[in-house]
């Protein structure tokens, strides 16, 4: 089975527990902290895959390293360790945070532009396109792409809205050829 699908199942289960216990904010904070800790300490993942350490020793390491996180997050980490799927934690974190954003009506977007967009322009894009995709707000990352010449290309999930000059020129070219 695909690793992304497996991670999504664990993320969904953790998300449901967070909702049931009314701890969504706390668990979100903990998941972000775990993701960051693992990203900054690659040796920790290597240590957990070291074959000479027993499962109990590895569990003790997780309990000690993540003593400050909530019980549901710690239990999820221990379950992943027991099932030899601890490597899924970064993907699980991404999936969990996507579920949280979705529940809050937030979508992630990438705006490609020839120049940096102002906060006002980003806010205007968010206001217009959030409604189009049925969300309350968009969190937009601006990437500079001088090849666009002008205008903006916006990617939300797997949808692309191309309002760039280069995109318009390409559409005109296709019309003239076809």
Swiss-Prot record:
Keywords annotated in UniProt: ATP synthesis, Cell membrane, CF(1), Hydrogen ion transport, Ion transport, Membrane, Transport
Subcellular location: Cell membrane
Gene Ontology molecular function, alphabetical: proton-transporting ATP synthase activity, rotational mechanism
Pfam families xrefs: OSCP
Record's bilayer topology term: Peripheral membrane protein
GO annotation, cellular component aspect: plasma membrane; proton-transporting ATP synthase complex
Matches recorded under HAMAP family: ATP_synth_delta_bact
Function: F(1)F(0) ATP synthase produces ATP from ADP in the presence of a proton or sodium gradient. F-type ATPases consist of two structural domains, F(1) containing the extramembraneous catalytic core and F(0) containing the membrane proton channel, linked together by a central stalk and a peripheral stalk. During catalysis, ATP synthesis in the catalytic domain of F(1) is coupled via a rotary mechanism of the central stalk subunits to proton translocation.
Matches recorded under NCBIfam families: ATP_synt_delta, PRK05758.2-4
Assembly and binders: F-type ATPases have 2 components, F(1) - the catalytic core - and F(0) - the membrane proton channel. F(1) has five subunits: alpha(3), beta(3), gamma(1), delta(1), epsilon(1). F(0) has three main subunits: a(1), b(2) and c(10-14). The alpha and beta chains form an alternating ring which encloses part of the gamma chain. F(1) is attached to F(0) by a central stalk formed by the gamma and epsilon chains, while a peripheral stalk is formed by the delta and b chains.
Family: Belongs to the ATPase delta chain family.
Protein name: ATP synthase subunit delta
Native source species: Geobacillus kaustophilus (strain HTA426)
């Amino acid at each position: 089975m695909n690793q992304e699908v497996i991670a999504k199942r664990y993320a969904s289960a953790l998300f449901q527990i967070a909702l049931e216990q009314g701890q969504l904010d706390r668990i979100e904070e903990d998941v972000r902290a775990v993701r960051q800790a693992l990203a900054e300490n690659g040796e920790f993942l290597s240590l957990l895959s070291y074959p000479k350490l027993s499962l109990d020793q590895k569990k003790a390491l997780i309990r000690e390293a993540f003593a400050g996180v909530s019980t549901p997050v710690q239990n999820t980490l221990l379950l992943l360790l027991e099932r030899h799927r601890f490597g899924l934690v970064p993907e699980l974190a991404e999936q969990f945070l996507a579920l949280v954003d979705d529940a809050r009506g937030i979508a992630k977007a990438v705006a490609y532009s020839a120049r940096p967009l102002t906060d006002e322009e980003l806010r205007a894009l968010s206001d217009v396109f959030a409604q189009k995709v049925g969300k309350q707000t968009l969190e937009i990352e601006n990437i500079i792409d001088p090849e666009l010449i002008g205008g903006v290309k916006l990617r939300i999930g797997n949808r692309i809205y191309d309002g760039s000059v280069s995109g318009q020129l390409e559409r005109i070219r296709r019309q003239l050829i076809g």
